[in-house]
């Protein structure tokens, strides 16, 4: 059941993306989570993927979700499952091979850096402190921005609740006609303010990626003198570090966005509940309005308490990743597994290439079809 759910969700993500813009990152995340959770059973899962029954279910899913399928999504449907099957098969085969390659790479790096172990550890420690200094303002900035946006959300929404209560107190006969516009505006304002909230908080992820690049580049320069004949191997490890750190930034962005959407989902039903009582008695409407104000304050406060600490948690995660690199390169590293981040990076690169190729082919197909269509629509000369 887990396998079927994951593969169906993979197809669904791709299909819903095809309606607007295909998000290769979403598809790659589904595939990587699938591979990670299956673990040692990945080979068996690949065999299941190839069964015709599952392919038929995917075909049914495309038909159910899309109805009339356009040329692009039909092409995607045909290519997605074989691509996923082949890629997971390669992941299974490459995992142990890559693990051994990374082990040897780290051994060579450690051997080369061993005479300078103290200096290398010091340089990485300096980099950690610089990273903490760079991220400090981000933590405070995110916390401030969350508070600002939450207060703005409450300021924008409360007046609508107050106006509806005022109309109710005035005992206006036609409550439905008087209150309904405010209830509609309240619901629209929820959508508008949640989108603004997401728009103000998610750009932090892009700023963080720039800081990550800067910090990793400084670390590379500081370690370069100690790794002159193994520079390529050091660069490879730093690429893995940057990938993992940027992944944290993307996860932060996704968590903020998901919490904002969750806030909207919790507020909208209360607004709809007011609508539902407009044709009922005054007492029911009054009760739903009281619930609306109290629910608004409660849910907004829960959102604030949940999102505020994200900056600090994110900072700690980034610092820990640099510390993990220090351990990998140190003389007492032990059996540190570092190959999975490289495997995931390779998967994401391949998924991006796959979708870029599909989009390019679709674009070329549309370009070729346009002149033929224009020719067919041209008036006949008499």
UniProtKB/Swiss-Prot annotation:
Key words, A-Z: Chylomicron, HDL, Lipid transport, Repeat, Secreted, Signal, Transport
InterPro entries: ApoA_E (IPR000074), Apolipoprotein_A1/A4/E (IPR050163)
GO biological-process terms attached to the record: acylglycerol homeostasis; cholesterol efflux; cholesterol metabolic process; lipoprotein metabolic process; phospholipid efflux
Signal sequence interval, chain numbering: 1-20
Subcellular location: Secreted
Region (Disordered): 361-382
Known role: May have a role in chylomicrons and VLDL secretion and catabolism. Required for efficient activation of lipoprotein lipase by ApoC-II; potent activator of LCAT. Apoa-IV is a major component of HDL and chylomicrons.
The name this protein goes by in its record: Apolipoprotein A-IV
Organism whose genome encodes this protein: Sus scrofa
Lineage of source species: Eukaryota, Metazoa, Chordata, Craniata, Vertebrata
């Amino acid at each position: 059941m887990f396998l079927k759910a994951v593969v169906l969700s993979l197809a669904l993500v791709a299909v819903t993306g095809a309606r607007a813009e295909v998000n290769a990152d979403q598809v790659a995340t589904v595939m990587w989570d699938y591979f990670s959770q299956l673990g040692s059973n990945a080979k068996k899962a690949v065999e299941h993927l190839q069964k015709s029954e599952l392919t038929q279910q995917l075909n049914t899913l495309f038909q159910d979700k899309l109805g009339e399928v356009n040329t692009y999504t039909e092409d995607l449907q045909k290519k997605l499952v074989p691509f996923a099957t082949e890629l997971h098969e390669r992941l299974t085969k490459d995992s142990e091979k890559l693990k051994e390659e990374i082990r040897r790479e780290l051994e060579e790096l450690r051997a080369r850096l061993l005479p300078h172990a103290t200096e290398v550890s010091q340089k990485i420690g300096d980099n950690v402190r610089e990273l903490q200094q760079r991220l400090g303002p981000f933590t405070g900035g995110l916390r401030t921005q969350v508070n600002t946006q939450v207060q703005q959300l409450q300021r924008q929404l409360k007046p609508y609740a107050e106006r509806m209560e005022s109309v109710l107190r005035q005992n206006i006969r036609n409550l439905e006609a008087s209150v309904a516009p405010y209830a509609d505006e309240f619901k629209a304002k929820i959508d508008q303010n949640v989108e603004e909230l997401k728009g103000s908080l998610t750009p932090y992820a892009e700023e963080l990626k720039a800081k990550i690049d800067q910090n990793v580049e400084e670390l590379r320069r500081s370690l370069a003198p100690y790794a002159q004949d193994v520079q390529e191997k050091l660069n490879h490890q730093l690429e893995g570090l940057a990938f993992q750190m940027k992944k944290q930034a993307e996860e932060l962005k996704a968590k903020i966005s998901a919490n904002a959407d969750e806030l909207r989902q919790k507020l909208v039903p209360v607004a709809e509940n007011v609508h539902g009582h407009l044709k009922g008695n005054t007492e029911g409407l009054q009760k739903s309005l009281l619930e609306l104000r109290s629910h608004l304050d409660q849910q907004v406060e829960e959102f604030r308490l949940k999102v505020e600490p994200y900056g600090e948690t994110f900072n700690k995660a980034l610092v820990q990743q640099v510390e993990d690199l220090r351990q990998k390169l140190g003389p007492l590293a032990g059996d540190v597994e570092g190959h999975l981040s490289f495997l995931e990076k390779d998967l994401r690169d391949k998924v991006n290439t796959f979708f870029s190729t599909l989009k390019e082919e679709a674009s070329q197909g549309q370009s070729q079809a346009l002149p033929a269509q224009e020719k067919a629509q041209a008036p006949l000369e008499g």
